[in-house]
Amino acid sequence: MAGWRTLPAMRWPWRRRNPPLDPWAELALEHGLNVQTPPEGESEDTPFHERFGLAAGRVTHLAESDAAATPQLRVALQTVPSDVRTRVAYRLHLIAERPEPLLPTAWRARAAGHPLELQVQRNSSGGDVVRSGDDGFDAAVHVLSREAQATAGALTPDVRDALAALFVSGRPAGTLVAGGGLLRWTADEEVGPSDPRVGGLMDAFKGLAHLEVLKPA
């Protein structure tokens, strides 16, 4: 019986694969943003912190839309000092700069919660609860402003719908602060770029940021 013949080694054409993106780069790519070098400094008086109203803490990750984009969108991840009460080590910020204010006043909003939480928000902001006249919206979203009457008059159905989408049940807990053309949503819990809830949150925030302001006739 003839012996076995040794077959020559076969060379398989391996395909080169690009290395997987890290979660931050993947989030930026998905939403059309460009990863940027984070700003230096971690105190509240650095230009970046002051411009966007951030508390102390180093910004470790940053992505933003093209400079010519309107509105200008940014996503930032920031480390924060250790807080025994919240146990939050980092915070996610969604930031939009619009050419014109969404509402003519300064205001803030968050999902409706315990009455004590609302009282804390009122004390810290000095604002009053805004009653839009839409009972369903007012029960789901708390809007605070020092100019409550003017803010209420500007809460059109489109604005209410966009805010309700941002604070719908299942979204990460957070607070939206607005003044001038600036909108900034800040997480009240740890939310990382790989969190499955971030995609829907980003879409809702962009919908609010791109909302057109209806001018009086």
Pin down the residues of each PLM region.
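Short, positively charged and aromatic/hydrophobic N-terminal segments
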Residues: R5-T6
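Membrane-proximal amphipathic alpha-helices
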Residues: R17-P20
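N-terminal alpha-helical "arm" segments
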Residues: A2, W12-P13
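Charged, low-complexity intrinsically disordered regions
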Residues: A25-H31, T37-A217
